[in-house]
Amino acid sequence: QMVKGYSIIANGGKDIQLTLLRNLEQNKNQKSIISNDLSNRLKKLLINVVEGDNGTGKSLRMSGYVIGGKTGTSRTYLEGIGYSDKRFNTSFTGFIETNEGPIVGSVILWGAIGSPISEYVTGGSTAAPIFKNIVRNLVPDK
């Protein structure tokens, strides 16, 4: 559902059919779900998560590319114990713009206990770097 919503934002408000592989033909002539203006405003907010000075997704910055999305972090609930102070559910859902159109995806980690880039376990320090590695393999270098 998150990827579907972000794909509508990233594609100018158009209702895009999701696929695991690129299939540009099936997404021609799709109806608009939200206005292009609203799509552009939402896209700017999501890009600011990556490009903004205080953005929680700044670990995703890649020179020459436009990337937007949202990080997420919550404490993991452990049966019989309650919410953990050491295990976290983290995520990044977002898009990268390419010449062929945006690529939209989501990375979700359940029970994360450490971060390779920070002392804090957050969506920006765990899921976002994985998203970045995925898109690096999908898009050419600029």
Identify the residue ranges that each predicted region occupies.
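Short, charged, low-complexity patches
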Residues: 123-135
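Gly/Ser/Thr-rich beta-alpha loop segments that engage phosphate groups in nucleotides
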Residues: 14, 71-74, 125-126
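Generic beta-strand/beta-sheet core signal
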Residues: 3, 18-19, 68, 96, ...
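Residue-level preference for non-acidic, small/hydrophobic
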Residues: 5, 42, 70-72, 93, ...
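Short, Gly/Ser/Thr-enriched beta-strand-loop segments that form substrate-interacting elements
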Residues: 63-97
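Short, well-ordered beta-strand elements
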Residues: 92-93, 101-119
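Solvent-exposed loop/turn segments at secondary-structure junctions
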Residues: 49, 73-75, 98-99, 109-114
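Conserved active-site-proximal loop/helix segments of enzymes involved in bacterial cell-wall
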Residues: 2-64, 113-124, 140-142
